[in-house]
């Protein structure tokens, strides 16, 4: 299972559904975000369960969203493998600046292909395939 942590914004939602989710699914993971979980529980319970149950997490920290940072901290406390991506390297929280981060820029040519390759190779690396 892969749980994705990210802000819910129009452009980022598009990137999730057209790029991130399909790329990770190609690697054999069942991919979900909290807004894809239906039920009557408090959303924070769905988020913490999603993080705890995941074998892999992807966190897009674009925009310094406080909810994303909270969830990233929770994943860190649970010692989860997290692939961090962002559109702006300065959005990386201080405590994570020592980590490898995938930076992407939607204004660059073929950015989507580059991001897909980087995510795919990183999944291989953290899964021990490479």
Enumerate the language-model features and the residues they cover:
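Defense-system signaling and execution modules centered on TIR/cGAS-STING-like, death/scaffold domains
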Residues: 1, 123-130
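Conserved N-terminal substructure of TIR/SEFIR domains
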Residues: 1-40, 47-50
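Short, surface-exposed alpha-helical recognition segments that flank or form part
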Residues: 35-38, 42, 110, 114
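A generic local structural motif
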Residues: 43-46, 70
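Short, flexible, glycine/charge-rich loop motifs used to bind or transfer phosphoryl groups or to couple energy/partner
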Residues: 46-48, 91-92
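An anion/phosphate-binding loop that grips the pyrophosphate of nucleotide cofactors and donors
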Residues: 54
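Cross-kingdom TIR/SEFIR domain
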Residues: 61-123
């Amino acid at each position: 299972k892969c749980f994705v942590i990210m802000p819910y914004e129009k452009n980022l939602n598009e990137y999730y559904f057209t790029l991130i989710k399909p790329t990770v699914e190609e690697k054999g993971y069942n991919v979900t975000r909290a807004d894809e979980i239906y039920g009557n529980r408090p959303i924070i319970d769905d988020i913490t369960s999603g993080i705890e149950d995941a074998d892999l997490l992807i966190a897009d920290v674009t925009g310094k969203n406080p909810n994303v940072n909270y969830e990233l901290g929770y994943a860190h406390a649970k010692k989860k493998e997290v692939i961090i991506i962002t559109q702006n390297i300065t959005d990386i929280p201080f405590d994570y600046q020592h980590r490898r981060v995938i930076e992407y820029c939607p204004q660059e040519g073929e950015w989507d292909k580059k991001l897909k390759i980087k995510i795919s190779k990183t999944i291989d690396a953290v899964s021990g395939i490479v």
